Structure formats: structure tokens, C-alpha cells
């Protein structure tokens, strides 16, 4: 074979090889395209099935929180959560908040809180000691997490609020507007369903803790009128976010603010703040038809702040150190009562739980259990109740729980801001321990210097 023939032969082989390679590449591309088309087609075909499955799961997850069980028997309180939001907020993006509270559905517990439209250690945190402003909003995040823009859900524009879950959706109540004409906006599953206008034109306000749901209906207490005199108080019954009934309390010489409410055996009990003239706490209990009873916790172990030293109580308001007050709670067990209160009698510091076995009906100051929650040398603040339904816990009773706000900043500390973190505890019938779980942040922050 001469050189020219060799060149032609080699060239022919290369050409054939190239053509075969090209055909294989074209075949591979066609195979990929066909495979992708089939895969995409299958995706489109399966989407309705996927949505159906999702909706079915959602429907299965929806229950009606009955609220017909009694409170679980307990002998103490186990720590449930601590968010450390002020400590984390010295370097992280954490909201400036007040009035945190916890509420649980049958699937989860969430921390709700009133933001100031500002972050800690930022210039907009200046002046956030103010209670009512158009920048305040109700938001929520998973319980135990520091509230930040990255884990929080907007709920409502509000400087006073409540929220609860009926087993199907979240109900939120957000009050905003001017002092002389505020409006409560009710949302169900995030959609506005009703409104309540201030009826006394004097700072309409509500619980700053969870509302209470029984058999698909949810209940809340609102106040309108003076904070240092006779005001007007109403109970509202709501179904799927709409007010279906309300009643004004006939309660001369009583004063109800910032009630902490819970279901128990199909009825609702609320323990509130008397900002007018009582250092013991007023209560109102009612059934699902809003037929109610009223009173004051009789115990000589006084629950408000400021308050006198423990002594002889009264089933009416105890006037000694009775003016002003702080949001709080108690749990009734027959004639006995678990009382949550600050350790200090004149400042919002420290916190303790006390079991008075006859304190709901008797006026002596004897008690049998005291559990430390926060040392008197550390700041506390508001406190309130929440419950965990059997649909969440798997128990055959309603578990009582409470949260404590740990206020930091103004007016007691040298900062430009006011905010707080929170801790929570739930009742158990097993071993517990008393200790101090303070906020623990080192102040001032960089913005304060």
C-alpha cells in the first residue's frame, strides 16, 4: 500500500469514527430529552394527587379542641422553655418586644409577642418604653426561640393582643388605634373576620395572653375605661373568628385587666389584674353561654404587685397597696389555688409559685409548697397562663402551664430601650426543682453607650 492509499484509508477510518460518535451523541441527546419529557409529564400528572394528599393530611390534622377535661393533678412545675432573646440580641437580629405569651394548638406551641418595629442594639430601639404606638405588631415564633425577622410570623397590627387555636385555625385579636377610639381586629386563619370598636373610648384593651377555646368556640375578656377607677368589662364568645355573643359584667367595685384565662371541665376561669384598688387578684368564671360568677382570690398570700406582706386576705379587693398592678395568673383546684407572683412586694423582680390548699375560699396566709422560679435579685415582669390540651399531650387531662416575662432596660436600667425575654413552665405530677432562671443579659449594649 503506497503512502497515498495509507492516507486515504486512515482518513476514511477517522471519518467513520466521527460519524458514529456524532450519531451516538445525537442519540444520547434524544434519550435525555425523551426522559425529561416523560419525567415532566409525570410531575404534572402527579400534582393534583400530591395536593389531594396534602389537603387530606391537613383535614386529618384538624380537630376540635374540646376543653372538657379537668386540669391535670400536679405537685410542681417543670421548666418548659427559655428563649434568651436579650442575650442573643446583643449580637443577633432580635426584635424589641414586650408582653410575650404562649399558646398551643394540637400540633405545636408558639410564643406570641408585641414588637416595637425595631431590633435590639439598633437606633430604632430608642424610646420603646412606650406601650402604645402605631409601630407595634403582634408576631409569633416557635416556643423557646429568640424572636427574630427570620423565624417570626406576622399576625396583626396591635399594641394589645390575644391569640388561641380552636383545633382548626389560629384566632388572633389585635387592638390598635388612638386611645379614644381603638378597634380590635379579629383574624381567623390570617383573614380578617370581625372587629370590635372601643365602647367607652378609653383605651380598649385585652388579655396579653391566650384566649380560651372549648368545643370550637373561643372566649376572651376585654376592658374599656379608667385604669384607676370603675371601668367596663366584657366577655366575648367567638366562632371561626366572628363574635357570636358578648356580655358586660355587672361588677361594681371590681376591676379586671389583662386576664389570664384557661378552660377547665368545659368552663372558663380567668384570673386578672386589679389596677384600681386590689392587691389580690379578681377572677371571673363562666360557661359557654356566658353565664358568669365573679370574685377575688381570698388567700392571705397576695398575688399582685405592689402588695402588702402576706396576712389576712379577703374575698373582695384588699385595698392595702392595691393601686397599680402587674399581669399575673393563678390556677384553681377545688378550694385550693396555685398562685404565681413576684418575690418582691414592690418591684417586678423575682418569681415564685405557691400552693395554698384552701386559698381560693379561705383568707389565711398558710401554704404548703413554694417553688422558686426567678431570684429576687433578678428582674421579672408580666406572667400568664396557658394550657396544653389532651389532643397535644396525649394525656386525659388539660395540662396547666405558665410563662414569665423577664423585662430588661428602661425604666430600671440605663439603656435607651425596653424589651424582654421569657421562660415557661408546665405542671407535672413528678419530680421538680426550684432554682433561678433569670434573663442573664449583660447591659448596657453598644447602642446605649
Swiss-Prot record:
Residues 71-449 are annotated as: Head of neuraminidase. The active site is at residues 131, 382. Residues 1-6 are intravirion. Ca(2+) binds at residues 274, 278, 304, 322, 324. It comes from the Viruses. Inhibited by the neuraminidase inhibitors zanamivir (Relenza) and oseltamivir (Tamiflu). These drugs interfere with the release of progeny virus from infected cells and are effective against all influenza strains. Resistance to neuraminidase inhibitors is quite rare. It is found in: Virion membrane; Host apical cell membrane. N-glycosylated. One of its GO terms (cellular component) is membrane. Substrate binds at residues 98, 132, 257-258, 273, 348. Residues 36-70 are annotated as: Hypervariable stalk region. Its cofactor is Ca(2+). GO terms for molecular function: exo-alpha-sialidase activity; identical protein binding; metal ion binding. The keyword Disulfide bond applies. Residues 35-449 are virion surface. The keyword Transmembrane applies. GO terms for biological process: carbohydrate metabolic process; viral budding from plasma membrane. Keywords: Calcium, Disulfide bond, Glycoprotein, Glycosidase, Host cell membrane, Host membrane, Hydrolase, Membrane, Metal-binding, Signal-anchor, Transmembrane, Transmembrane helix, Virion. It catalyses: Hydrolysis of alpha-(2->3)-, alpha-(2->6)-, alpha-(2->8)- glycosidic linkages of terminal sialic acid residues in oligosaccharides, glycoproteins, glycolipids, colominic acid and synthetic substrates. Residues 11-33 are annotated as: Involved in apical transport and lipid raft association. InterPro entries: Glyco_hydro_34 (IPR001860), Sialidase_Influenza_A/B (IPR033654), Sialidase_sf (IPR036278). HAMAP family: INFV_NRAM. Belongs to the glycosyl hydrolase 34 family. Catalyzes the removal of terminal sialic acid residues from viral and cellular glycoconjugates. Cleaves off the terminal sialic acids on the glycosylated HA during virus budding to facilitate virus release. Additionally helps virus spread through the circulation by further removing sialic acids from the cell surface. These cleavages prevent self-aggregation and ensure the efficient spread of the progeny virus from cell to cell. Otherwise, infection would be limited to one round of replication. Homotetramer. This is Neuraminidase. The lineage of its organism: Viruses, Riboviria, Orthornavirae, Negarnaviricota, Polyploviricotina. The gene is NA.
